[in-house]
Amino acid sequence: MLTVVGITADGHLPPAGRALVGRAEVLLGGERHLALVPAVPGQVRRPWPRPMAALPDVLREHAGRTIVALASGDPLVSGIGTTLIRMLGTDAVAVVPAVSSVALARARMGWSAEESAVVTLVGRDADALRRELAPGRRLLVLSSDETTPAAVAAILDEAGFAGTAIHVLGDLGSDDETHTRYPGPVPRLHVLALEVAGTGLASWATGLPDDAFENDGQLTKRDVRASALSRLAPVPGALLWDVGAGAGSVAIEWLRAHPLTSAVAVEADPERAARIGRNAARLGVPRLDVVTGRAPDALTGLPRPDAVFVGGGATAPGLLDRCRDALAPGGRLVAHGVTLETERLLVDAFHAHGGELTRLAVEHVTPLGGRFTGWTPARAVVQWAWTKEHLQ
């Protein structure tokens, strides 16, 4: 059993944690944390191994001894405790939390947990912040290093939220604690508190404007995209395959639905695949996994999906059956077609497997002559939606 004890910036340990640290035969942690704890005779002190994947070897080396690790604040708030549990398992790790930097930041700002959100950029692409931006939101940003405030300021400016107040809360809980506004000095250890202001794109609803996506015309349009996503039904923890992804709009909106969703966009054209990556970053979901290749071959080795969207290439031999077979029980498949050949395929699939078959026809008002307007129909889309039975 590895016990992880939280420690604050000034070296404070929770009472239970202090006793555990004092009795530990082996103490692990970052060099800064180890330096904050008084020496204990006979105690072995080791910094975290690099890479962290070597940790099991360190634990085996000290098997049979009492091992305690130090971590910042609450180890399970975007901390190493989460990494250790994923690596070693829940039964192998015990956690004794201290006050987290998030709790201290909320206290300094006077923000309740209910009216503020936490975004971690530790070891992550700063573009992940974009999804969270909306006028009036209060965001606590866990920074990766001293360069994070500049990256955040650049994103705010580019995304239309240049009026956001950026508070830099440094060395929280220590005698050297600071509270400044950016631009200004940035301590190595800090949390950003953002009071978001501006007029940038700020919707979590499905059906973002088509012009939100860089595209070459291969794009699932706004109205039919919203219909598809309502049937794909994104939920936390669910994985989507977006097959024939085009501009990646369906996968991107799936990811924007919740931070714990995941998605793989499969696109045969390399230029479009690169474009998908740019769209994902600009719309706040850089975690999108883009696979360049032609389905169904490109699907080999992908993790099992909870939902599949086939927006292009449905006529590829065996593709729909491959997607149906890959789905987890209860998984959802949505396929679109605009050609007679694809429509025929989807009608056959409907008759063979059931589900829901819908023809989506949308018209928009456009100028007609010099003085009038009229309805212009978009190309109709046939949509087949199917759910895999739990007992299959």
Locate the predicted segments by residue.
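Class I SAM-dependent methyltransferase SAM-binding "motif I" and its flanking Rossmann-like core
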Residues: 8, 72-136, 296, 306, ...
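Conserved SAM-binding loop of SAM-dependent methyltransferases across substrates and taxa
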Residues: 247-259
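Glycine-centered, small-residue-biased loops immediately flanking beta-strands
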Residues: 238, 261, 331
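A contiguous loop/helix-start segment that scaffolds small-molecule binding in enzyme catalytic cores
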Residues: 1-4, 14-16, 64-67, 135-218, ...
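S-adenosylmethionine
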Residues: 268-273, 289-367
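Conserved class I S-adenosyl-L-methionine
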Residues: 237-246
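Class I S-adenosyl-L-methionine
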Residues: 1-99, 103, 126, 260-263, ...
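Conserved SAM-binding loop
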Residues: 276-277
